[in-house]
Amino acid sequence: MNSDLKSFDKIEQKIGGSRKISNYIIGGMLTIGGIGFLLASISSYTGRDLLPLGNPSTLLFIPQGIIMGAYGVIANLLNFYLWYLVYINFGSGSNYFDKSSKSIEIRRKGLFKDIEVKLNFDEIKSVKLDISEGFNPRRRIALVLKGRKKPLPLSGAGELKPLLQVEEEGARLAKFLDVNLEGLK
């Protein structure tokens, strides 16, 4: 974000989606594991070793081969779903704030369609910092809207920025929108 947002009329924030290194690593492990389990199941059924390691042809097809086949099918279904999310870059998008027209556009890439939310500045009650530490930490910026109980998150899911950076971005955005900042303790 820009350092002095009061002097600018527009802000555009890019939000990263599911194309993260962790998703590539998990997808690769699921691919290898799922194919391995399916090959072990087929090997136990046909009696021929299709894997370079081990000796899966000696496994009994009932129950070990069937169970390994089920694990392989489940892993490959999860694998297909994860690679599809990475392919479409699920959750990516942008936040666009325009001071001259007093409008806000929030765009995200959904599972089957794009999601777009358009708001006016007068619909904003405040900017909220949602910060929780511990086992599953969360640091995000959200807009509190008038007449709505749940805040509208602006930062991407799973995005863990340093605490100071989140506080500075929240303060700058609240100053730009000319609303209060909530969530600081």
UniProtKB/Swiss-Prot annotation:
Pfam families: Ycf4 (PF02392). It is found in: Cellular thylakoid membrane. Keywords: Membrane, Photosynthesis, Thylakoid, Transmembrane, Transmembrane helix. GO terms for biological process: photosynthesis. One of its GO terms (cellular component) is photosystem I. The chain crosses the membrane at residues 24-44, 66-86. The keyword Membrane applies. InterPro entries: PSI_Ycf4_assembly. It is a multi-pass membrane protein. This is Photosystem I assembly protein Ycf4. It comes from Prochlorococcus marinus (strain MIT 9301). The gene is ycf4.
